[in-house]
Amino acid sequence: MQPRKPQQIARELALLSLSQLPVNPKKLDTLLDDQLVSKLVLGAVRTLTSEVQDTLNNAAGELQRSNDRLLSSQTRASDLNSARTMLQEAIACTQTAINQLGTAVDFPELIQLANQDKGVRNYAKELVITVNENRHIIDELLSTALVDWQVTRLAQLDRDILQIAVAEMKFLGVPDSIAINEAVELAKRYSGDDGHRFINGVLRRVTEQKKTA
């Protein structure tokens, strides 16, 4: 695996800490470097912990429903198929949780680079501030790009990935193709099985709408 660039590390820190940091940009902008790093890392840990716990709870729920269906059925084909589907959902949820836990091995690198590389922490801060300052505009762009869906109904990490990508494209001058590719890579690490395809599709529609606006 190739070493990740400072901006890639910054995006990951911003993604994992976005929902945990102060919404008021002024509060974040006044933090000293060591305070900023501490808040970024703590926010990342809390987000990842919450995501893994929720995913495992979903897996446990699907397993229980599958088990209940098997115990109460009379081995009808429809019941067996339903139980099989629930079991597959549980396996998928468990795999997602395992993948999310696997990213924890990168935390020492995140912490070290955030401490040593000013560019990492500054870009992470810029991303969080830009999203919070322009959240209404960003969410409007996403709402028009979502098909039969609402921004508020998206999974937290999916929503944050999309918001960061749109912030980069619209406000930070990042080329659309780079912002989309980086968002897709984040989705592969932190979203569900088809999350990266969903993220890619939404962001492609955002760029198409920008061209016709």
UniProtKB/Swiss-Prot annotation:
InterPro entries in UniProt: NusB-like_sf, NusB_fam, NusB_RsmB_TIM44
GO MF, one annotated term: RNA binding
Short name of any one Pfam family annotated for the protein: NusB
Record keywords, A-Z: RNA-binding, Transcription, Transcription antitermination, Transcription regulation
UniProt record, GO biological process: DNA-templated transcription termination; transcription antitermination
Domain of life, per lineage: Bacteria
GO CC list: cytosol
Alphabetized SUPFAM superfamilies for the sequence: NusB-like
Function (record text): Involved in transcription antitermination. Required for transcription of ribosomal RNA (rRNA) genes. Binds specifically to the boxA antiterminator sequence of the ribosomal RNA (rrn) operons.
NCBIfam families: nusB (TIGR01951)
HAMAP family linked: NusB (MF_00073)
Family that this chain belongs to: Belongs to the NusB family.
Protein name, UniProt field: Transcription antitermination protein NusB
Species this protein is from: Nostoc punctiforme (strain ATCC 29133 / PCC 73102)
Gene symbol of the encoding locus: nusB
